Curated annotation (Swiss-Prot):
Superkingdom in the source lineage: Archaea
Keyword Ribonucleoprotein: yes
Database matches in Pfam families: Ribosomal_S6e
Sorted UniProt keywords: Ribonucleoprotein, Ribosomal protein
Entry GO MF terms: structural constituent of ribosome
InterPro entries, per the entry: Ribosomal_eS6, Ribosomal_eS6_arc, Ribosomal_eS6_CS
GO biological process: translation
Family membership: Belongs to the eukaryotic ribosomal protein eS6 family.
GO cellular component terms listed in the entry, alphabetical order: ribonucleoprotein complex; ribosome
Protein name (record): Small ribosomal subunit protein eS6
PROSITE patterns for this protein: RIBOSOMAL_S6E
Organism of this sequence: Saccharolobus islandicus (strain M.14.25 / Kamchatka #1)
């Protein structure tokens, strides 16, 4: 059975400021089970000045570009931020496990406020979301360890059929659509009959899209 995916977007992170930082593995930052595989949000520490400079609320992204053969590849990870004023300016402390993902324990990276991230959770944990509808909110702390409230904006089932906010229930239905989600017309006024899911999360839903609400 595939993992259940939660896509989280921060609507206040439109054009985040990007700065060059030094990222370091630090023994104070404990690894969290699943963080390297995207099943948990890893922790990072910055000082208050760096947090304010980047206008960070809860999440920070670190990004590097490295050479792999004849290609340049971007590597990035998202972290839950904790303030620690023992961390020098323009420096980010992370766990050794996450440093391995970047290929070094001490490296330069671009840091910015996270715009979007995806977390995978086991299907048994996802049962807590069954019955919720598009537009509903839930606390993410117990589910994925993030101290934020999330609002459901959409999702898709195990066949890739999207949820529709304007169709009540959880069943799969074939309806006439004039726009997204589920259909993107090539011409004005074009309509097409498409298969979609209703607005309610069921056992068949494998991904939901959410935004942070404050």
């Amino acid at each position: 059975m595939p993992d259940f995916k939660i896509v989280i977007s921060d609507p206040q992170s439109v054009e985040p400021k990007r700065i060059k930082v030094k990222a370091k593995a630090n023994d104070q930052i404990k690894s969290i089970a699943g963080e390297k595989e995207g099943k948990a949000v890893p922790q990072a520490k910055v000082n208050e000045k760096t947090k304010q400079l980047l206008n960070i609320d809860t999440l920070i992204t670190l990004e590097i570009t490295k050479q792999e053969g004849d290609k340049k590849v971007k590597v990035k990870s998202h972290f839950k931020v904790e303030v620690d004023n023992n961390v020098p300016d323009n420096e980010v402390w992370i766990s050794k496990t996450m440093a391995e993902k970047f290929g070094a324990e001490d490296f330069e990276a671009i840091a910015y406020r996270t715009k979007t991230l995806q977390i995978s959770i086991d299907q048994d944990k996802a049962t807590n979301l069954v019955g919720l509808k598009i537009g509903d909110t839930f606390e993410a702390n117990q589910l994925i360890g993030l101290p934020v409230k999330l609002k459901i904006t959409g999702g898709s089932d195990n066949s890739g059929f999207p949820m529709r906010f304007d169709v009540t229930g959880a069943a799969k239905r074939k309806i006439l659509l004039s726009g997204p989600p589920g259909f993107y017309p090539n011409e004005d006024g074009e309509r097409r009959r498409k298969t979609i899911r209703g607005n309610t999360i069921s056992q068949e839903i494998v991904q939901i899209n959410t935004i942070i609400v404050r």
